[in-house]
């Protein structure tokens, strides 16, 4: 299996640090507001990567943090007249609900930055002791010029970073690119006791502390959006390797592309967000997954209603295949499941090519539909179809009532009753079942292989 490593800039054979164990850390959200579909894109991609590694037999330990203290959270909370912790916890709850609705596997741990302050202070103190950091007026900064290989992830020198960034002049700093590990307290901000006085953690140190605590000094995979490569992930490497003395801090760096709305990145700062809640009110979770997985995780993706509508139609086709019931009267037909499985794994082994893997599932769906249309069935083919769909996190649940009850068994019962009525030549009653279901939004389609149903959009 080969994966693209941002650190080397090329495809590399995936070899975990420890046999069949994979330690995976993915940067979580800053819960300043409701999660948007840019978040959905990122976490769907890393969920599928995790699912596939598990399918391959690896034991994956997956950590995803919450940056629950930050300048923007403080500003928004102050504007609303509430505590930053209240705002953060409220949005964390919304986020976790959204992840469940998208069928994203929960992380093994969701550490919060505010709960890791003792570990953060330990690391900052260690960096000062080793000469990599310095304290001034209650704040602590990292000396980037002392960091061996600083810029190796973003593939830039300090001079290029200086030229390409707006660096605020700060008389506290020894060098303009030095970054804060600990920030001195300001009036109205949450703060913690530290050897340097009251203050709070800097952004970058939080992820180093959480990955070190839950995964150790070295991890296999670190993921996040491409907008985090610099400065966040670059600074994570600097802090972690300087503190532990162990290199590399991360063996494989994986970064997903960003979601665009037209030509612009979708982001809070641009105010062009579509929340996950809004998207799920119009489209199914399967449609959102198909939309995301139809492109490489490394590529940018452009949001459009047309693309989501096409994904919903594709999801509906797959749901009908998944909902098919075994008919004992149909002839068992052979499907080359080995070839389909090999195709799927070949694509996924090539840097998680979900687009081609998804196409394989659609091809299998078409073959199963053709077989049923000829009054046949493939038990093995149907089983593989559901297995591969599950690796991509497609639930393919056909329909639910507003109360959350699965209505599929009731619809199947009505279809069976309609079939019996037609055999008994009670066509008026049979037609009444069809029209009643149609009114309820359920469309019946009759064929030589039997009757299938789908939810009308």
UniProtKB/Swiss-Prot annotation:
Binding residues for ATP: 268
Cofactor note: Binds 1 zinc ion per subunit.
E.C. number(s) listed in UniProt: 6.1.1.16
GO cellular component terms, A-Z: cytosol
Protein residues bound to Zn(2+): 27, 207, 232, 236
Motif segment ('KMSKS' region): 265-269
Co-factor requirement: Zn(2+)
Reaction(s) the record says it catalyses: tRNA(Cys) + L-cysteine + ATP = L-cysteinyl-tRNA(Cys) + AMP + diphosphate
InterPro entries: Cys-tRNA-ligase, Cys-tRNA-synt_Ia_DALR, Cys-tRNA/MSH_ligase, Rossmann-like_a/b/a_fold, tRNA-synt_1_cat_dom, tRNAsynth_Ia_anticodon-bd
Top enzyme class: ligase
Short sequence motif named 'HIGH' region, residue ranges: 29-39
First-listed, main subcellular location of the protein, grouped into a coarse class: cytoplasm
Similarity annotation: Belongs to the class-I aminoacyl-tRNA synthetase family.
Protein name (Swiss-Prot/TrEMBL): Cysteine--tRNA ligase
Source organism: Dehalococcoides mccartyi (strain ATCC BAA-2100 / JCM 16839 / KCTC 5957 / BAV1)
Origin organism lineage: Bacteria, Bacillati, Chloroflexota, Dehalococcoidia, Dehalococcoidales
Gene: cysS
